[in-house]
Amino acid sequence: MADYSFDIVSKVDTNLIEESISVALKEITNRYDFKDSNSSMELNTKDNEIKLSSADDFKVKSLYDILLTRLSKRGISLKNFQPGKIESALGGTAKQSVKIQQGIPADKAKEIVRIIKDAKIKVNASIQGDQLRVTSKSKDDLQATMALLKGKDLGLDLQFTNYR
């Protein structure tokens, strides 16, 4: 009998983030409360972060709220975004960086494997870099594992791919 498997990943589509940022920037240019505030949002794909800057702390918080609204309207889970502290910058401005979590960190991967083993479902879970591979002889066991993980709040948006 053949083995069946699927992968557990946690990825955010950077194209959707770019589109959300451009829509948010258009909204900012049209809003009266952001007039003459030199507000900006920049996506840094190398560091997986979004940099927000504006005239003061309140406007940076508003920028973050606008960004989250636009991301959620695109269907992007907000679990993978961790905001940093709002810092004062030169010229009386304020800035904030928002980290984008791509992949499953090692500690979360170990936690997921432990949850699967504690459930006593007949599956094997193995960590492969920033994703997990779950294998079993039964498709029903794999579906039970998916349902188990969907029911848990792990602080990450998990996607199930490569179902074979």
From Swiss-Prot:
Q: Which domain of life is it from?
A: Bacteria
Q: Which UniProt keywords apply?
A: Nucleotide-binding
Supply one GO CC term from the record: cytosol
Question: Is Cytoplasm among this UniProt entry's keywords?
Answer: no
Question: Tell me, what is one Gene Ontology molecular-function annotation carried by this entry?
Answer: nucleotide binding
Q: Does the keyword ATP-binding apply?
A: no
Q: Which Pfam families match?
A: DUF520
Show the InterPro entries listed in the entry.
Answer: DUF520, UPF0234-like_C, UPF0234_N, YajQ-like_sf
Checking CDD domains in the record gives:
YajQ_like (cd11740)
> According to its UniProt record, which protein family does this protein belong to?
Belongs to the YajQ family.
- Role: Nucleotide-binding protein.
Q: What is this protein called?
A: Nucleotide-binding protein Emin_0136
- Which species is this UniProt entry from? Elusimicrobium minutum (strain Pei191)
